[in-house]
Amino acid sequence: MSHRDTLFSAPIARLGDWTFDERVAEVFPDMIQRSVPGYSNIISMIGMLAERFVQPNTQVYDLGCSLGAATLSVRRNIRHEHCRIIAVDNSPAMIERCRRHIDAYKAPTPVEVVEGDIRDITIENASMVVLNFTLQFLEPAERQALLDKIYQGLNPGGALVLSEKFSFEDAKVGELLFNMHHDFKRANGYSELEISQKRSMLENVMLTDSVETHKSRLRKAGFEHSELWFQCFNFGSLVALKAGVAA
């Protein structure tokens, strides 16, 4: 059961850096719905993309799976036999709850839930890979290597879904979308104190890139096609395609 996010409703003397601990895991569904505009749309559309791209006898990777929302959306939309989903997260609290969520919904496609570092996971025989608000928590210097590995592990015709919070090269646009995002959080019941404290905790661990930077990395990794397919304020999702025809 998810609880309402009140983690930052009272002043915290020493904020520290953000961690995906048990307290965050407990309120995560409420937190992300009230904090990330368009999150539900992205999750449901990841399922639609899975219906198009997941092939029989292949694997799907959900890297940074949190509580398994994207994994469940993919599994609901797989139309082929002998597929497998591998869901990975490095937070023990998230993984524990993810396993419970996955087990609560029965489906023919097996899901392997792995507690581990996504940088250490071998990607192979993949028809689809999901990075749903995950890359932004890696050190910027490590992001290209992960995308390179994903491209190498994708089968021809495979797809990567990359959802992120964006920064903007145009400062005026960046300021507008930043303020609209804060209006979104206020409209969802967050106070100025809650918004400020959470932002302070995240600023050293969530480092955002522009859409242009993401596309440049994807091209460097080898992806022949990539485009922004969803955006709401300063949040959005890209799809990157590996050339070729799925076997």
From Swiss-Prot:
The keyword Transferase applies. It comes from the Bacteria. Pfam families: Methyltransf_25. Keywords: S-adenosyl-L-methionine, Transferase. GO terms for biological process: tRNA wobble uridine modification. The keyword Secreted does not apply. It is an enzyme of class 2 (transferase). S-adenosyl-L-methionine binds at Y39, G64, C65, S66, D89, N90, D117, I118, N132, R199. Its EC number is 2.1.3.-. GO terms for molecular function: carboxyl- or carbamoyltransferase activity; S-adenosyl-L-methionine binding. InterPro entries: CmoA, Methyltransf_25, SAM-dependent_MTases_sf. It catalyses: prephenate + S-adenosyl-L-methionine = carboxy-S-adenosyl-L-methionine + 3-phenylpyruvate + H2O. Homodimer. Belongs to the class I-like SAM-binding methyltransferase superfamily. Cx-SAM synthase family. Catalyzes the conversion of S-adenosyl-L-methionine (SAM) to carboxy-S-adenosyl-L-methionine (Cx-SAM). NCBIfam families: carboxy-S-adenosyl-L-methionine synthase CmoA, PRK15451.1. This is Carboxy-S-adenosyl-L-methionine synthase. It comes from Salmonella paratyphi C (strain RKS4594). The lineage of its organism: Bacteria, Pseudomonadati, Pseudomonadota, Gammaproteobacteria, Enterobacterales.
